[in-house]
């Protein structure tokens, strides 16, 4: 039995960047934000997986993929001083032979955990990933994937 395309099986939600509260401003990332995001990501790495640290080149590579639209596929939370508190990326890598997968990456600076930033970020990532699945003409399974370090 043939499956219908994902666009006929998945309903696209309304996707909007989170709104700020408590001095937090959300916006899409730009390449100019890489160093600020790296600072946040290195604190996350130190707390969650100290034997593996994200390096600048990895972030640059993620931001430069032809299949990443920074304006639509990223969300970053900043404090009033411009410090990154949380960041997220949704990417759909090529090679969709057996499934269409949306990978949800990012995290929350350890000192800012417990404020609800992660819940807001994940909600946005799930919506954006679902929106991307709903735009696919593929007749494959669709997955939203994320990874947890503990």
What is the role of each PLM region?
Residues 2-63, 76-78, 83:
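Short amphipathic alpha-helix that is part of the acyltransferase structural core
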Residues 114-131:
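Conserved acetyl-CoA-binding loop-helix of GNAT-fold acetyltransferases
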Residues 109-111:
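Active-site acidic-Proline motif in GNAT/NAT acetyltransferases
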Residues 65-69:
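Short loop/turn motifs at secondary-structure junctions and domain boundaries
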Residues 74-76, 82-92, 103:
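Conserved beta-strand in the GNAT
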Residues 24, 73, 140-144:
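Residue-level recognition of the N-termini of beta-strands and the immediately preceding loop/turn
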Residues 93-104, 113, 132, 136-141:
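A conserved beta-turn-beta hairpin within the catalytic core of GNAT-like acetyltransferases
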Residues 146-150:
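Short, intrinsically disordered, charge-balanced linker/junction segments flanking boundaries
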């Amino acid at each position: 039995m043939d499956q219908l395309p994902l666009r006929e099986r998945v309903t696209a939600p309304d996707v909007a960047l989170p709104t700020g509260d408590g001095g937090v401003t959300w916006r899409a990332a730009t390449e100019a934000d890489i160093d600020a995001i790296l600072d946040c990501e290195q604190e996350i790495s130190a707390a969650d997986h100290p034997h593996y640290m994200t390096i600048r080149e990895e972030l640059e590579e993620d931001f430069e993929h032809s299949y990443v639209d920074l304006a639509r596929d990223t969300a970053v939370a900043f404090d009033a001083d411009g410090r990154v508190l949380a960041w997220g990326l949704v990417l759909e890598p090529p090679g969709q032979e057996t499934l269409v997968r949306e990978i949800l990456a990012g995290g929350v600076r350890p000192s800012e955990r417990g404020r609800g930033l992660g819940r807001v970020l994940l909600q946005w990532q799930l919506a954006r990933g679902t929106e991307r699945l709903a735009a696919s003409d593929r007749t494959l399974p669709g997955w939203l994937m994320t990874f947890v370090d503990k």
